[in-house]
Amino acid sequence: MPPSEVIACEDRERAVWDSVLNESYRRLREALDEEQKGKLQAMQRAWMASRDKNCEFLYDYFQGTMANPMIAACLCRATGMQALYLRGFADDVAERK
């Protein structure tokens, strides 16, 4: 599969994970008090910075034609993992109420 097709596939999957992540973040945020909302926002910003640095590292390491597919895969995988983490957390908070 050409790199451009790999990137397009990863981007489509990441769009799905972005949707799950955003919905889970919204659900979790609605269930928290103001102090916890601020901490959630700080955590999410730190996660985004970490995700970006991790994926930039792969980009720098692979370089050439493999760099862009690798960064697309990295962003997709990281977004999926964070989406599942937030969804699990939101589900747990909902069960406790």
Identify the function of each model-found stretch:
Residues M1-K97:
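N-terminal alpha-helical modules
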